[in-house]
Swiss-Prot record:
Its job: Component of the CENPA-NAC (nucleosome-associated) complex, a complex that plays a central role in assembly of kinetochore proteins, mitotic progression and chromosome segregation. The CENPA-NAC complex recruits the CENPA-CAD (nucleosome distal) complex and may be involved in incorporation of newly synthesized CENPA into centromeres. CENPN is the first protein to bind specifically to CENPA nucleosomes and the direct binding of CENPA nucleosomes by CENPN is required for centromere assembly. Required for chromosome congression and efficiently align the chromosomes on a metaphase plate.
Native species: Rattus norvegicus
Lineage of origin: Eukaryota, Metazoa, Chordata, Craniata, Vertebrata
Family: Belongs to the CENP-N/CHL4 family.
GO cellular component, one term: nucleoplasm
Subcellular location: Nucleus; Chromosome, Centromere; Chromosome, Centromere, Kinetochore
GO biological process: CENP-A containing chromatin assembly; chromosome segregation
Record keywords: Centromere, Chromosome, Kinetochore, Nucleus, Phosphoprotein
InterPro entries documented for this protein: CENP-NAC/CAD_complex (IPR052011), Chl4/mis15/CENP-N (IPR007902)
Subunit structure: Component of the CENPA-NAC complex, at least composed of CENPA, CENPC, CENPH, CENPM, CENPN, CENPT and CENPU. The CENPA-NAC complex interacts with the CENPA-CAD complex, composed of CENPI, CENPK, CENPL, CENPO, CENPP, CENPQ, CENPR and CENPS. Interacts directly with CENPA. Identified in a centromere complex containing histones H2A, H2B and H4, and at least CENPA, CENPB, CENPC, CENPT, CENPN, HJURP, SUPT16H, SSRP1 and RSF1.
Keyword Metal-binding belongs to the record: no
Primary localization: nucleus
Transmembrane segments: none
Protein name per its UniProtKB record: Centromere protein N
Length: 340
């Protein structure tokens, strides 16, 4: 086995958590069952990596085999990437329904990249919900592909959506987009203002897969009794007012966010560009031609659930601004706010 391939494999093994080692190697389906059983998973990672390298040398493992293992590791740890969402479209009057041929898609995608760029490594794997995972390691006309900084693509056949991890070589982005459009038989490709490390949440948002069934508020008696925690010895009027206010906040929150778990996003960003306006005449900003610019960014490990909890916690009034509640429905978490 080539020295560079062995080093690539060593680095992959070192970054796989021991608790996932057996699962990932089994899913890789390169080593035999007997070889997998012979691996001592209780030894130090460095020795474990050498043992796997020797087993792969016996089977004459190639760079493509290692690239596939790296792709599988990324599928298990997809949250380590920042994913951008793109929406493709067909030509006006084009056929909206095309039969998808997996082999043709892979062949066309790979051929376009290799025609334009001699040194490129492309790997494919069909994963959950028939999604096509693609790993592209980019080189140049004069250098071999950098296997340690690949781009990952997740495409759902017969849909317009594709998810792409950040590319370290910006010059390769147009070529990647061209290969995707041609292979999937689309004409245009536009980036949405939506990105996150939680790929599953992004797919739930663009495909509207999160539960949108709102609760029925015709009867709130059981909710009042079980969740308010009011003391029975308080004045009955105060209890009634507190109960009604909590019910109102609860209803407004559920109407805005629904009664289902929210997709997990880490941030939302708002860029404000607006002219200065004042009822008071004059002022140093009154004649300013350039718009005022402001950037506001909200961040949280689970931003939408955090926003959903603001009003019930008494931190914000209801209803919340539509700019905060429309993120899933608008399919965006990057906003530009102008005068219009």
């Amino acid at each position: 086995m080539d020295e560079n391939v062995a080093e690539f494999l060593r680095r992959i093994i070192l970054k796989i958590p021991l608790c996932e080692m057996k699962t990932i190697l089994e899913a890789w389906d390169f080593l035999s069952e007997d070889q997998l059983q012979s691996i001592n998973l209780k030894q130090r990672k460095e020795f474990l990596a050498q043992e796997v390298i020797l087993l792969c040398e016996d089977k004459c493992a190639s760079l493509d085999d290692m690239a596939l293992l790296d792709l599988m590791y990324t599928q298990f740890h997809r949250h380590q990437k920042l994913w951008n969402v793109f929406q493709m479209s067909k030509e006006p009057g084009g056929n909206d329904v095309d039969l998808f041929d997996m082999e043709q898609f892979q062949s066309s995608f790979k051929r376009i990249l290799q025609r334009a760029l001699k040194n490129v490594t492309v790997s494919f794997r069909v994963y959950e919900k028939n999604s096509v995972w693609i790993r592209v390691a980019w080189g140049t006309q004069y250098s071999q592909p950098n296997q340690y900084k690949p781009t990952f693509v997740v495409y759902y056949p017969q849909t317009p959506y594709v998810f792409i991890s950040s590319c370290y070589l910006k010059s390769t982005v147009p070529l990647l987009h061209q290969a995707l459009k041609v292979a999937s038989k689309h004409h245009q490709m536009a980036q949405l203002d939506l990105r996150s490390r939680h790929l599953d949440s992004l797919t739930a948002i663009v495909f509207n897969e999160y539960d949108q069934t709102f609760e029925n508020y015709n009867s709130t008696a059981s909710w009042r009794e079980g969740s308010l925690g009011l003391k029975t010895d308080l004045d009955s009027k105060i209890i009634h007012e507190n109960t009604e206010e909590k019910v109102r906040i609860h209803r407004a929150t559920q109407e805005a966010f629904g009664a289902y778990p929210q997709p997990q996003l880490e941030f939302a960003q708002y860029k404000l560009e607006t002219k200065f306006k004042s009822d008071v005449g004059g002022g140093i900003l009154a004649d300013r031609k350039e718009p005022l610019r402001c950037l506001v960014k909200f961040s949280s490990p689970h931003l939408l659930e955090a926003l959903k909890s603001l009003a019930p916690a008494g931190i914000a009034d209801t209803p919340l601004s539509p700019l905060l509640t429309c993120i899933p429905s608008k399919k965006m978490n990057y906003f530009k706010i102008r005068d219009k």
